[in-house]
A protein has these predicted regions:
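N-terminal cap/lid segment of alpha/beta-hydrolase-fold proteins
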Residues: 109-148
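Accessory cap/linker subdomain of secreted extracellular hydrolases
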Residues: 258-340
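Short solvent-exposed beta->alpha transition segments
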Residues: 9-10, 25-71
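Alpha/beta-hydrolase active-site loop
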Residues: 205-227
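Short beta-strand/loop motif that positions the catalytic acidic residue
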Residues: 341, 347-349
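Conserved alpha/beta-hydrolase "acid-adjacent" motif
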Residues: 354-360
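Short, surface-exposed "cap/lid" segments of acyl-processing enzymes
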Residues: 146-180
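Catalytic active-site module of serine/aspartate enzymes centered on a nucleophile-bearing elbow/loop
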Residues: 383-387, 391-420
Length: 420
């Protein structure tokens, strides 16, 4: 029997009570199968701990409220009060009584506003579709006003279920970049990830290669067909995991003219996950934080061990990723792949980034590539992982405050592309 809106709110109240008690193993039992495959108890525990640490610790999980006008699924917002502001748990309760979506959003409802360096009178945008079949994804093509032909970039967002703008709370860093670059006469194509557009269609053996290569290569082909785009000046611009994936995409299409890597992670991701968890645990120390780090370290050790097989259950692995995903990641070395490419590269890193760091990630790119004249590597000392400016000890709470990619980053990318 399917439940109505009142029943959906009852499910949400039970979910909220489990969140308050931090009973994450029981929470995942409420997930619909696609969500359960994508988000493990440990991944949820880590995300919850990150939000709690960034806001000074959770004080209370409040009464759920449904979004007006929705019947199936019912969108529900659950406010979480913290010592410093708070955040909102957003979920969708289906008529089957299960949770079909989940994200943690900052409080405040702040809307994105264009950065001062974007001028909407200087470009046009249109919707596009990349690929065919069940995992085809929608995107946006931004073209400068004028005949061109212009240099172009394909934007690649970071790890997770991101839309084409890499939206997170009030911020849209990829939209900042897209509008900033197209204002400066660079064509830009950005797209929703399949993990965002089709979370219920992902195969069990889905990998990072499946996540990034098909839409990115389709984007390059589409740009090459545009008369306003110079076909020999199409580049990839990847942020975070998008930067990690960019050399792999370029290796699959030698026509790609160059790479721009922003906070591209190079440390093996299972190791980085433990490092970041330790950073977050230090912000809100306690037995729960220690247990979270220890559990994640055990999962990471399994990823690194010969015992990892395609049949290893995802609940035993970090971040809820499948064994196939981890096996693919383990076999891929982004730095070695980049070293095998002949194309020019611009590698930028934020000095205040605690997710991808100068010591753990940029050093690997520098050791392999800094001697090459066609590779430029720069650190923006005041920038965090999103390349937003800031100061002091970096925390997740920064991501909840409205901000924009630093103008200097947009200008540096534009100048680098102009020289290609």
């Amino acid at each position: 029997m399917r439940i109505d809106k009142g029943g959906a709110l009852e499910v949400a109240r039970g979910f909220a009570a489990l969140l308050q008690a931090e009973r994450f193993d029981e929470i995942v039992e409420l997930f619909a199968p696609p969500l359960r495959a994508a988000v493990s108890a440990e991944a949820l525990r880590l995300a919850w701990a990150a939000q709690a640490a960034g806001h000074g610790g959770v004080r209370a999980v409040e009464e759920p409220a449904s979004q007006a006008g929705e019947a199936d699924p019912v969108r529900v917002h659950i406010p979480v009060t913290c010592a410093n502001s708070g955040f909102t748990v957003v979920t969708s309760v289906g008529g089957d009584g299960l949770l079909h979506g989940l994200r943690l959003d900052p409080h405040g409802g702040a809307e994105w506003h264009p950065p001062h360096y974007a001028d909407t009178a200087r470009f046009t945008e249109r919707d596009v579709m990349l690929g065919t079949g069940p995992l085809a994804v929608p995107g946006t093509l931004s073209l400068p006003v004028g005949p061109g032909p212009w240099p172009a970039v394909v934007l690649l967002s970071g790890g997770g279920a991101f839309d084409r703008d890499e939206s997170s709370g009030p911020n849209k860093p990829l939209k900042d970049l897209a509008w900033g670059l197209v204002t400066r006469q660079v064509a830009v194509l950005r797209f929703d990830k399949a993990t965002f557009a089709h979370p219920d269609r992902l195969p069990q053996d889905f990998t990072m290669a499946d996540e990034y290569l098909p839409p990115a290569l389709a984007a390059v082909r589409l740009l090459r067909q545009q008369p306003e785009v110079a076909p020999d000046r199409i580049h990839l611009l990847g942020h975070s995991m998008g930067g990690k994936a960019a050399p792999r995409i370029a290796a699959a299409d030698p026509s790609i003219a160059g790479l721009v890597l922003l906070a591209a992670d190079a440390q093996p991701m299972h190791e980085a996950a433990v490092r970041v968890a330790r950073h977050l645990a230090a912000l809100a120390p306690g037995p729960g934080a220690e247990e979270m780090v220890a559990a994640l370290a055990r999962q990471a050790a399994l990823v690194a061990s010969p015992g990892l097989t395609p049949d290893t259950p995802s609940k035993l692995l970090p971040l809820g990723f499948s064994a196939s995903y981890w096996l693919d990641l383990r076999a891929y070395d982004p730095v070695a792949t980049a070293a095998g490419l002949a194309c020019p590269m611009l590698i930028l890193q934020g000095g205040r980034d605690y997710q991808v760091t100068v010591a753990d990630d940029l050093a690997r790119w520098q050791n392999a590539l800094a001697h090459r004249p066609e590779v430029t590597i720069r650190i923006h000392q005041d920038a965090n992982h999103l390349f937003f400016p800031g100061s002091g000890h970096p925390t997740p709470a920064e991501y909840a405050r409205p901000g924009h990619v630093e103008p200097a980053v947009v200008d540096e990318i534009t100048a680098w592309l102009a020289r290609r």
